[in-house]
From Swiss-Prot:
Induction: Up-regulated by As(III).
GO molecular function per UniProt: arsenite methyltransferase activity
Catalytic activity, reaction form: arsenic triglutathione + [thioredoxin]-dithiol + S-adenosyl-L-methionine + 2 H2O = methylarsonous acid + [thioredoxin]-disulfide + 3 glutathione + S-adenosyl-L-homocysteine + H(+); arsenic triglutathione + 2 [thioredoxin]-dithiol + 2 S-adenosyl-L-methionine + H2O = dimethylarsinous acid + 2 [thioredoxin]-disulfide + 3 glutathione + 2 S-adenosyl-L-homocysteine + 2 H(+); arsenic triglutathione + 3 [thioredoxin]-dithiol + 3 S-adenosyl-L-methionine = trimethylarsine + 3 [thioredoxin]-disulfide + 3 glutathione + 3 S-adenosyl-L-homocysteine + 3 H(+)
One Pfam entry name: Methyltransf_31
Originating organism: Aquipseudomonas alcaligenes (strain ATCC 14909 / DSM 50342 / CCUG 1425 / JCM 20561 / NBRC 14159 / NCIMB 9945 / NCTC 10367 / 1577) (Pseudomonas alcaligenes)
GO biological process: response to arsenic-containing substance
Function noted in UniProt: Catalyzes the transfer of a methyl group from AdoMet to arsenite, producing methylated arsenicals. Involved in the conversion of As(III) to dimethylarsenate as the main product in the medium and also produces dimethylarsine and trimethylarsine gases. Reduces the arsenic toxicity in the cell and may contribute to the global arsenic cycling.
Name by which UniProt lists this protein: Arsenite methyltransferase
UniProt-listed SUPFAM superfamilies: S-adenosyl-L-methionine-dependent methyltransferases
Family: Belongs to the methyltransferase superfamily. Arsenite methyltransferase family.
Application in biotechnology: Could be exploited in bioremediation of arsenic-contaminated environments.
Protein's gene: arsM
pH-dependent activity: Optimum pH is 7.5.
Length: 346
């Protein structure tokens, strides 16, 4: 599928309106504080970028960031402003045409930002070892609707875990299905290029993440995807797809389930862009100044990561009270509020 994807994104598509679906289009509004950063990106870079939304977790100042499937470099140039002069951003992509756009504007952005902290490499996201990147060299790894295009997602997650520093995270948006797709759908080149044919069944993805050390995958946000192209909808039948953002932490001590140790945290309100509340994931919106009960895993995700200075921690692991209330299974995504977009994107 590599050649097919390279052709689709390098030659067939010229801008996002050429796509046939809104798969991997993030319907959530972009935070106001990010919009000025996006306006600093060169127009050609933005025009040749086929994703929607922006994959940017909080608190990136000084971080070393890796973008998997960086395309024309739009997200990299936004992230460059967030990590600042003391941080760095590396984009990896397999499509020569996209990399040419990204590299053509390195000097433009360095002059605009006042520092040069972005670089791009040609490579495959499932074969990062060939780029000779050192173990534990990144604080954060991001990806915007690209992992579904990889024919070897197992290797992508294994390499991401290897490259993250302890306490680091893989923060990414992608497309997931509510079932395992038939072979003929997974081999369909148009469906694959539109980010649908390569979509994992959500439960298979979570098992895969756990197998590679990401013990407690956290869903940040999600939206159902509308398949508005009638021919594609006919092929897909009753299969349903979701655009979802996950964060996967590389942390020792995480447990398979959310266990209750009587712990709590208090958010200090000190993270830039999150004065009133910090959103860890879909089920954890932590208001400033409020005592917020948490499970042991959430405690570690806050205490053993870059977020620790922004919280007060109450309790420890000395006493166990059983399973944390509300920890369960089932389809994690919302079935309502289907994604709609004025222009298609992937």
């Amino acid at each position: 599928m590599h050649e097919s994807v390279q052709n689709y994104y390098g030659k067939v598509l010229q801008n996002s309106s050429d796509l046939k679906t809104s798969a991997c289009c993030d319907a959530s509004s972009m935070p106001a504080w990010l919009k000025p950063l996006l306006s600093q990106v060169h127009p050609e870079v933005s025009a040749r970028y086929y994703g929607c939304g922006l994959v940017a977790p909080a608190l990136l100042d000084g971080c070393q960031v890796l973008d998997l499937g960086s395309g024309s470099g739009r997200d990299c140039y936004v992230l460059a402003q967030l990590v600042g002069a003391s941080g760095s951003v590396l984009g990896v992509d397999m499509t020569a045409e996209q990399l040419a756009v990204a590299n053509a504007h390195l000097d433009y952005h360095a002059e605009r930002f006042g520092f040069a902290n972005v670089s791009f490499r040609h490579g495959y996201i499932e074969d990062l070892a060939s780029l000779e990147l050192a173990d534990g060299s990144f604080d954060v790894i991001v990806s915007n609707c690209v992992i579904n295009l990889s024919p070897d997602k197992d290797s992508v997650l294994r390499e991401a875990y290897r490259l993250l520093k302890p306490g680091g995270e893989l923060y990414f948006s992608d497309v997931y299905a509510d079932r395992r797709l038939a072979d003929e759908l997974r081999q369909d080149e148009v469906l694959y290029g539109e980010c649908l044919g390569g979509a994992l069944y959500w439960n298979d993805f979570e098992h895969l993440a756990r197998r590679h050390g990401f013990t407690d995958p956290r869903l940040v946000e999600d939206q159902p995807i509308s398949i508005t192209d009638s021919a594609l909808a006919e092929k897909l039948g009753d299969a349903r797809f979701y655009s979802a953002t996950y964060r996967l932490f590389k942390l020792d001590g995480l447990e398979p389930a959310c266990e209750d140790y009587g712990q709590a945290v208090i958010y200090r309100g000190s993270i830039p862009g999150a004065a009133h509340a910090f959103v860890l994931d879909k089920h954890h919106r932590i208001e400033t100044g409020r005592v917020f009960p948490v499970c042991g895993n959430t405690w570690r995700m806050l205490q053993d990561t870059r977020f620790a200075p922004h919280f007060q921690f109450i309790g420890d692991f000395s006493r166990h009270f059983g399973l944390f209330e509300g920890c369960g299974g089932g389809l994690p995504y919302d079935r309502q509020a289907a994604v709609t977009a004025a222009t298609s994107c992937c």
